[in-house]
Amino acid sequence: MTATWQIVVHGLVQGVGYRAACVDEARRIGLTGWVRNRRDGTVEAIAQGEPDQLLALCEWMREGPQHAQVSSCEVDKAWVADSPIKGFEQRASI
């Protein structure tokens, strides 16, 4: 059953290649969605796929790429998408 999760990562996660690495990992896993930086210094992802795929992305996001220092990771499993998402992309910062 396809689900949509919002994942917000805190810590040193901007300026370290986090979004690009997240796109690569999400595509490797087979998810759709997007990732972006937020003004508050966090990285937000909306990911759509099977629960086991989403769990795999969450596990990766808790570690991130080599230079990231993740302090916490919030997951909203009740996030509702307006429609199915195609592909996985890096979006502009908000």
Identify the function of each model-found stretch.
Residues 1-94:
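Intrinsically disordered, low-complexity, mixed-charge
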